[in-house]
A protein has these predicted regions:
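FIC/Doc superfamily catalytic core
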Residues: 1-201
Length: 201
């Protein structure tokens, strides 16, 4: 059964396809229309603006804090009763260098503030911070899927792996459309969305 959506789709496969198509198109617009430049850097408000833009045509909850508890495998994301406080703490975390930025990213992943679309929106948010603070972005096409997922799974206990992995993929091509579009495709690939190429939408 598909997650409740604005498209009236009841098949999970149909929803996944449309969600990928529509939100990848919106992700491209974030870059092409320079909309990211208008969003807060490194705050939940900035992340919510990204999430809202990506998913507003698909889900009523776009940009809004989830109202259910979430888990993936054996890992439980921040419980609802602590979520607001967690997000306020993340806003206050420093972002002055690479290590601090990744630590902030790891905490936002643990918070997992949205019902759906956390990973995809938070990777854009991470690049937005890196670009503004240290003049770099991650070239996600250089980050192996299995390595990334394993490093993120371990990151709440030990964040050294995700730091090493992302540091090795940093590029100073912060205004490259190709790096951004390939990055969106790779980001979606981590989550199993591979039907559409962002540049072709």
């Amino acid at each position: 059964m598909a997650l409740e959506n604005k498209l009236g789709l009841t098949s999970s496969a149909d929803l996944a396809r449309e969600e990928e198509r529509i939100s990848k198109k919106k992700a491209a617009q974030l870059f092409d229309r320079k909309l990211l430049d208008t969003f807060n850097v490194g705050t939940f408000a900035g992340l919510a603006a990204i999430h809202m833009y990506l998913f507003e045509d698909i889900f009523d909850f776009a940009g809004e804090i989830r109202t259910v508890n979430l888990a993936k495998g054996n890992f439980r994301f921040a419980p609802l009763m602590y979520l607001q406080a967690a997000l306020e703490n993340i806003d206050k975390m420093p972002q002055s260098n690479f290590d601090k930025i990744v630590e902030k990213y790891v905490e936002m992943n643990i918070a997992h503030p949205f019902r759906e679309g956390n990973g995809r929106s938070t990777r854009i948010w991470l690049d937005h911070i890196l670009k503004n603070e240290i003049g770099k972005v991650v070239d996600w096409s250089k980050v192996d899927k299995e390595d990334y997922l394993l490093a993120m799974e371990r990151s709440p206990i030990k964040d050294v792996e995700i730091k090493v992995l992302l540091k090795g993929a940093l590029t100073d091509e912060i205004n490259s459309r190709e790096v951004y579009m390939k990055g969106i495709d790779h980001s979606y690939y981590y989550e199993g969305y591979t039907t559409f190429k962002t540049e072709e939408l």
